Structure formats: C-alpha cells, structure tokens
Amino acid sequence: MNAQLIESDDEHHWVLLDHRVTQLVIDRSSIRIQTWSLDGSADIRLAAAFTMQLASGATRHVEPADTERLAPCLALVGLGVRSVTVTRNGTLTLAFSDGSSISASPDVRRSSWDVQGGGILEGMAYAGEPGIELW
C-alpha cells in the first residue's frame, strides 16, 4: 500500500509513498497541487495565504492571488509528497521530499484550502472552512 493514515484526536497524518507532484495549476485566486501514484491521487487547493518553508530553510509568505510571488511553488513540480497532515482546528501541512513544506491555517472569512483523494486515498477529504472543527 502506498499510503498510511495515522489518526489521533487532534490530527490526521497521511504518510504517502511514491507520490509526486504531477501538476501545479494557478488561477486568479488559488493554486492547486495534484499528486499521483499508481494506486491513488490527491488534489490540494490553496485559496488563502500560506507559509512555504523552502528546502534551504528560508520561509515565504505566499498569497495565491498575488501570482507574481508564486515562483517558489514552481519548484514543487516533480517532488515527492511525503505527507499530508490536517489538524482538528483546520491547519493543513504538506511535506515534500526535498525538505520543503507548506502550512495553511484556517482563514476567518473564507475557505482557505481543501483536499480530495482518489483511489486508495478516497477517504482523504477535508476542507479548511472558517470556524469549523474538522471532526
């Protein structure tokens, strides 16, 4: 199996094996990261500000609507996705094979992110909605 879910009361931690970022889609108000393996896929949409920790250790605050500043995200294409972690209070963290990561907190005004899995990741379905605990 290419994925394992580790559940606790406060978080769901999905460990992914052999998953790579196959597409990065940019539109006017969000970015979409698509990951794929032979057994499953995940579609992750980020529609509010998030923090990107680069492999070099540098940190970038990224606003998806500010397309001129999305350049660091381009380096994600082709990287392995090591894990997807969602907390009960609505924080999403993605960890990549080069040591970089993305962390998206809930936004008080709008849906800030969503995750949808397919194949063996069918149970991976979360949405970072304002003011809502996820489980």
Task: Name what the model sees in each region.
Residues 1-135:
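Surface-exposed, interaction-prone regions used to assemble/regulate multi-protein complexes
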